[in-house]
Amino acid sequence: MSEEDWPSPKFREHVIQRLEPELARNRQNAPNLPVPGDARQVEEYVFAKCMSKDEYMRTIAKVINAINCNSKSAAVPSVLQPSQFHSPPCTTAVLGTGVGTPGYRAPVPPDPQPTSAQARNPPVTTATTQASTTPSAPAVTGTVSASAAVAAAVASFPSPDSAALRAAPGGQTTPGSQPSSGAPGSTTPNAPFPNGAGAQPGAPTMNGGAGGPPMGQPPPQMGAPNMGMNGPGGYGGYGMMNGPPGAGGPMGGNPYGQPMKKEMDQSRGPWDPQGHMYQQQQPWGGMPPQQGHGGYPNRPMNGQQTTPTGTSSVLESLINQPQQYPGHHNQMAPPGGDRNAAGGRAGVPGNPGGVPGAPQRPGAMPVNQGVMSIEDQNVYQMKLRNMRGSCDSLRTRARQCRQEGNHEAAHKLEVMLSVLEGRRVVSLEYLNHLETWIARKQDFLNINPMGGGNPGHMGMNDPVMNGDHGMMSNGQVHNPYGHPGYNHGQYGMGGPPPPHHMQMHQQQMWQQPQQQRMMPTDPMMMGGGGPMHGGPMYRGDMGHEMNSPVNSHRHNPYPSPAAMRNNMRGMQNGPGPIGRDRNSMSGSMSGPSSGAPSLNTMGTPKMGAPGSIGGLSNLDDFTYDDFLPNPIDALQPTLHIGPGSSMGGGPRVNLNDAARKELQAMEGRFEIEPNHQRHDANHIIVSAKMRNQPVPPLRLVVPITYPSGNVTVDRTAIDLDAYLYDDLQNVVHERLSRPGLSSLTDYLNAWEEQVNQYMQQNQTNGGMDAAFGVGNDFFYDNLNL
């Protein structure tokens, strides 16, 4: 191919340039959770790992998206952490090959995670349970946490290759890759683990007694994902997260030792997913073989790769991990006992006494440490069923956002969709946040029709979204998080309320008159739906940072997506001032802790200071608003908007007559987004799509004084579609960067000409190459980024 095509240095250099700003943002927004290495190291790692352009492009897209998610959700790594512990060891085969060859990964230290077995169906569920990330382990430290946070967003990579990867010698780890922290026991045959005898006394057992960090202290380098309840401080979850209880899995003292698929495993012969997986997972029969210091096993992953390989370890988990979140599958719950049982289940039912040398840790965090109890799993399942009705709306909105070029918003919606459809398992706390967010963004999601017809959908008619944020219809203070257990200190501290509490809560919510439930107040516009005072700050300042360039005001929670404004325009006739400052809602209502209900949801806007109500008024921003708006588009439109802006995020941005007429003349060939975004005080972004070619939209930055002033092309920093059409985008932007183009017509004509020329050239090759031969829907549906 040409020198600009993969794998040419020029092509790779372009990818590196695209990665650098994302890594920079990651380092800035999440300094405590850095993605190790610079852009070149990351790209080289991916390049060494991938054998085809298709595989390479998909992997880069995953990395970029993961980095972006990590940067935006560094404060919530617990929600995403689990996945980091589940990367299939041999995913090197990614899309290109159906099998992961250890030799292929040889250049990069193998990922110590034994998740290949875990990737198997039954194990997957168990692994996901292990991956449960509860806020209890706030000490997310080290790059691993970052990878976890990053990987979580991309972990669920249900594409066909993931299955192959998992089936592949995922457990195989190159010899010598044993985690340093892992005891030899971890490398012992998996079979012994089911009995608990497999782990040597010295090995970190699922109890986490051996070698586990002091209670409450995260395993070395692992940060403290609360994955395990067993090990030190309940770090056993790590082990679980690491992967199938298989070799060194949660059962094995060092899941990574096994995960690394030491020579020992390799010597055992071809990877036997079931043998490997079930041998160690037999203990799961009673409970997930959590290694009290499952975290430790993970630590090997870090420790082992903290060195130059540290980067690969994080990236490995980021790229390879199948999304394994806290088990929402009941299968995950150890039938033999409560996963959350204190002592971290020193001994699995099948392993009385636990692994030798792994004393039961009475101090282990008993609840929500990383594995959900059966009761919590029931709540999780019930919530999924209740929210299942939102899937179509989320899917529609995601598609709409993507069509409008707002890929970050679309991605976030797709992640939520994958959770609701059960393709991705998350912690109960994350699900609670998602439930409340969906309830509050009812209007944005166009879920109104379901509000009255689907009483089972707890979130849709939640008073939170209807403006009755302060109290329930019966006068009881409403818990913004959607269930009694999701309040105040309980948030992330105690287990979610039992199912019957949830049912009661739902009943209370349904008691509200239909009129109130369907009230036209747009939660999005009303300060994001009301203060989420009940819980701890879920995302720290970062959430605010992303949502508002003007830190003193957080009006227009969602001005960026044009679809939102479009959807909200019809709401402008609704009662009450809708475009008030986000904090006006917070200021007008008392937090759940105050017990003082407030009915002033539709009253006069109150411009509360961001720190009002003890600083908790910002919580809704941090907790929810950063789910959808992306920091790139969401911030720009708010720059010029004042507190009195209308609900759509401020006055509509209109082009002047000259620009509008010029675009109207081109409407036969181009579809122009009617709702323009403001790029800055003097420029407006116009998004155009070709009617005859399914290519990413072109974003033109038009001066408000057009035709005076220069039109430029805006290329978002994170444009996953640009990776799907990377070659095309490179050609297009190179062409549009040449001198000679000045008017909107010039740019659109040049764009169309270049795209048609590119398509014709590719037709001779049988169409676009594999990396771009699939549509966006296929890409996102399968990658679930």
Swiss-Prot record:
Domain of life, per lineage? Eukaryota
Cited Gene3D superfamilies: Coactivator CBP, KIX domain
Q: Does the keyword NAD belong to this entry?
A: no
Which UniProt keywords are present, listed alphabetically? Activator, Nucleus, Transcription, Transcription regulation
Q: Where is the composition biased (Low complexity)?
A: 122-140, 174-189, 279-291, 333-343, 584-598
Chief place where the protein resides = nucleus
Q: Does the keyword Transmembrane helix apply?
A: no
A GO cellular component entry from the record: nucleus
The cross-references to Pfam families, in alphabetical order and at most eight, read:
Med15_C, Med15_N
Q: Where is this region: Disordered?
A: 101-140, 161-228, 249-311, 323-363, 575-602
Query: Which molecular function terms from Gene Ontology are attached?
Result: RNA binding; transcription coregulator activity
The SS bond pairs are none
Where in or outside the cell is it found? Nucleus
Q: Where is the composition biased (Gly residues)?
A: 344-356
What GO biological process terms are annotated to this protein in UniProt? Answer: regulation of DNA-templated transcription
Q: Where is the composition biased (Polar residues)?
A: 301-311
Q: How does it assemble?
A: Component of the Mediator complex.
Family recorded in the similarity comment: Belongs to the Mediator complex subunit 15 family.
Q: What does this protein do?
A: Component of the Mediator complex, a coactivator involved in the regulated transcription of nearly all RNA polymerase II-dependent genes. Mediator functions as a bridge to convey information from gene-specific regulatory proteins to the basal RNA polymerase II transcription machinery. Mediator is recruited to promoters by direct interactions with regulatory proteins and serves as a scaffold for the assembly of a functional preinitiation complex with RNA polymerase II and the general transcription factors. Required for activated transcription of the MtnA, MtnB and MtnD genes.
Q: What is this protein called?
A: Mediator of RNA polymerase II transcription subunit 15
Q: Which organism is it from?
A: Caenorhabditis briggsae
Point out the gene that encodes the protein.
mdt-15
